[in-house]
UniProtKB/Swiss-Prot annotation:
PANTHER family: DNA MISMATCH REPAIR PROTEIN MLH, PMS, MUTL, MISMATCH REPAIR ENDONUCLEASE PMS2. GO terms for cellular component: mismatch repair complex. GO terms for molecular function: ATP hydrolysis activity; ATP-dependent DNA damage sensor activity. GO terms for biological process: mismatch repair; regulation of DNA-templated transcription. InterPro entries: HATPase_C_sf, KRAB, KRAB_dom_sf, MutL/Mlh/Pms-like. Transmembrane segments: none annotated. It holds the Pfam family KRAB. This is Putative postmeiotic segregation increased 2-like protein 3. Encoded by one of the numerous copies of postmeiotic segregation increased 2-like genes scattered in the q11-q22 region of the chromosome 7.
Length: 168
């Protein structure tokens, strides 16, 4: 059994590819890579990992992954190994915060927010979805649907989560 060697950092949960390795991946594998990297990134940021350090990893900007750009590194090149700044520790968080994080995704962009809201409606069985944006989603993102909604026992956690993330 492995024991914890120190604080977990973004480089511990990231996957790197050389240009040649990246070329050998099929399109679905590249999409899965981007999804996993963005999810890892959002989880780390949500538990207090330094946003500015997390957004740049091994020469790859998180925005490049979001935009579907190729995140490969040059063979033998591992810039973060020579970084003057040590990795930030991820601190434990309380149960309430864990519940709030598990209640929904950390929103990295407007398109991610809209996608998650629509997916939530579809997961709830919606067959009709109305989407309203005010000022291109800066002031308001509202999704109305005819789905089953949220079960009563989960409602309280969603209220506190929504109020904390309503100012994207």
């Amino acid at each position: 059994m492995n024991t914890l060697q120190g604080p977990v950092s973004f480089k511990d949960v990231a996957v790197d590819f050389t240009q040649e390795e990246w070329r050998q991946l099929d399109p679905d594998e590249k999409i899965a890579y981007g999804d996993v990297m963005l999810e890892n990134y959002s989880h780390l940021v949500s538990v207090g990992y330094d946003y500015h350090q997390a957004k740049h990893h091994h020469g790859v900007e998180v925005k490049e992954v979001e935009q579907g750009e190729e995140p490969w590194i040059m063979e033998g090149e591992f810039p973060c190994q020579h970084s003057p700044e040590p990795a930030k520790a991820i601190k434990p968080i309380d149960r309430k915060s864990v519940h709030q994080i598990c209640s929904g995704p950390v929103v990295l962009s407007l398109s991610t927010a809209v996608k998650e809201l629509v997916e939530n409606s579809l997961d709830a069985g919606a067959t009709n979805i109305d989407l309203k944006l005010k000022d291109y989603g800066v002031d308001l993102i509202e999704v109305s649907d005819n789905g089953c909604g949220v079960e009563e026992e989960n409602f309280e956690g969603l209220i506190s989560f929504s109020s904390e993330t309503s100012h994207m």
